[in-house]
Structures are given as C-alpha cells and as structure tokens.
C-alpha cells in the first residue's frame, strides 16, 4: 500500500515519543500527574490524526497500550508499553522517513567516510551542535564517535534498536570485508532489519559483496556522479530537506569526487 502519511505526521509522532520519554524520566516524582494527563491527551490526538482506529494491524497494538494509559493508575511499565507501540507504528507507517544515518565502514577507510560526512552535511543532514546529537553516527570520526568505554557493537545495536528510524550507509571495500568489526555491524543491521544503502568504494565491485545482507539491493559506486545525484534526491525526501541550488550541488559533488580520487584506498 502506498505511504499516504506526511513528514509533519512523522514529526508529530516523534514529539509524542519524546513526551513519553520525559514522562518516563520523572515517573518516580509524585507530582508528575499533569505529564501523564498530557501524554494521554496527546496520544489520543495522534490516534485520530493517523486514523489508527481503522488501521490494521496497528489497531490492536495501539489500543492495548492506549487503554492502559490511565492518568490515575498509570504505571511506569504502562508508559514503556506505549513507547514500544508508538515505535512499532513509526517503523511500520513511516518506513520511508528517517531520523538518523549510520555509516558502517572500516576504520582504514576513515578518509573516505570523512569526505562522505562533509557531503551529507552539505545536503542538509544536521551536524552535532551545542551538546545536541546530530543526525549521523559512526565509529571513527571525531564528533560522531561511540562514547568512551562503550562496547562498539553493543552501542551500535542499541542505536539501531532505539525509537529512531535509522538509514545505514555501508561503505563496502576490501578493508570492510576483511574486518570482523565491520561484519558485526553488518550483522546488527541485518538482525534489526534496518534499511541500508550499499555504497561501493573505488577498490571494490558489486560482485564481491557477500555476507549477511541482501546483495541484490541496489547500491552505487561512491564516485558515480549520476548515482550521487539520485542519492541526494532520495535523502532530501527521506529527511524532508530543502532542495539545493543545483549549481552549488554540482560543485560540492564534483569536489567530493575529486577528493576521493586523491585518496589512495589501497594504502589507507
């Protein structure tokens, strides 16, 4: 069935999820009655806006959790159930909209990942600012790193299993295929059924893709300017970004490709 939901509705669902998380944080505070009332009203408004009363299979999922969200007797577990239900609905109904990008790459391909991150920011993907997370996370670039003392694989799994819709960009290369850590990341993407783009680095080919993930999903060579145009257009739709001035985009794209050509992949 064609997706008839809007990015504005996606944002509203995110706001309700944020409200539920805030309600959860201060749940032990006896004065949080008003936050529970507000959460119940807002969830009710969301149900009407998304027409979930007549939407199956989402109907049972939301109604079970909606019915137990009573502001007088609501327990912490009840709010957790609501968060779980809304997250499931978000991933089902808004599968073509995304909150974040995960770049899965070999640390030996760091220089290429760095250039890609710069290109993504030029397209409009948000940077980390003023202590707030941006829309990109990966394992080897300052500002986007996994926190110190965190287990990389477990942290990535937790991010992929969060309430966020995550789009994974997999930078396939010989380095990637020879890295146990990278294959663990690919396994996490497969287990969580996360949407992904196969991006083929200059030293690699489509025929060499193997492992957990579907090799038939359409990807592109990272230095293919026409495929980069299509990639940019898709990101604008996925993240509801403003259209770019085409001349500026062409300059950014061509600069990106030129910088890639100056990176000696074999010696990374």
Task: List PLM regions with ranges.
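C-terminal interaction surface of TIR/SEFIR-family domains
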Residues: 2-35, 64-88, 92-95, 114, ...
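Conserved TIR/SEFIR loop-to-helix hotspot centered on a Trp-containing motif
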Residues: 40, 174-191
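Short, highly selective alpha-helical patches that border small-molecule cofactor pockets
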Residues: 109, 113-117, 182
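Conserved BB-loop
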Residues: 121-159, 174-179
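Arginine/glycine-rich "motif VI" loop of SF2 helicases in the C-terminal RecA-like domain
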Residues: 125-129, 187-198, 202
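Short beta-alpha junction loops
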Residues: 142, 174-175, 196, 200-207
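Switch/connector loops and helix/strand junctions flanking conserved nucleotide-binding motifs
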Residues: 145-147, 178-181, 205-212
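Inter-motif core of Ras-like GTPase G domains
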Residues: 167-170
């Amino acid at each position: 069935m064609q997706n008839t939901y809007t990015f504005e509705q996606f944002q509203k669902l995110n706001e309700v999820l944020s409200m539920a998380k805030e309600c959860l944080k201060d749940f032990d505070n006896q004065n949080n009655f008003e936050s529970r009332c507000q959460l119940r009203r807002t969830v009710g408004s969301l149900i009407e806006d998304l027409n979930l009363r007549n939407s199956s299979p989402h109907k049972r999922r939301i109604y079970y959790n909606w019915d137990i969200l009573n502001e007088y007797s609501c327990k912490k577990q009840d709010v957790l159930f609501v968060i779980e239900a809304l997250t499931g609905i978000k991933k089902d109904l808004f599968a073509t909209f995304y909150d974040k990008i995960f770049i899965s790459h070999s640390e030996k391909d760091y220089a290429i990942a760095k250039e890609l991150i710069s290109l993504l920011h030029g397209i409009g993907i948000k940077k980390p600012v003023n202590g707030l997370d941006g829309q990109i996370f990966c394992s080897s670039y300052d500002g986007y790193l996994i926190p110190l003392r965190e287990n990389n694989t477990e942290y990535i799994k937790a991010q992929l299993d969060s309430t966020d819709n995550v789009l994974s960009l997999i930078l396939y290369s010989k380095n990637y295929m020879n890295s146990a850590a990278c294959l663990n990341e690919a396994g996490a993407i497969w287990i969580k059924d996360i949407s992904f783009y196969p991006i083929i680095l200059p030293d690699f080919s489509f025929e060499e893709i193997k492992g957990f993930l579907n090799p038939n999903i359409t990807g592109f060579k990272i230095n293919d300017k026409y495929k980069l145009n299509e990639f940019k257009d898709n990101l604008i739709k996925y993240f509801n970004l403003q259209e770019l001035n085409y001349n500026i985009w062409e300059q950014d794209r061509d600069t990106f490709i030129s910088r890639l050509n100056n990176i000696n992949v074999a010696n990374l």
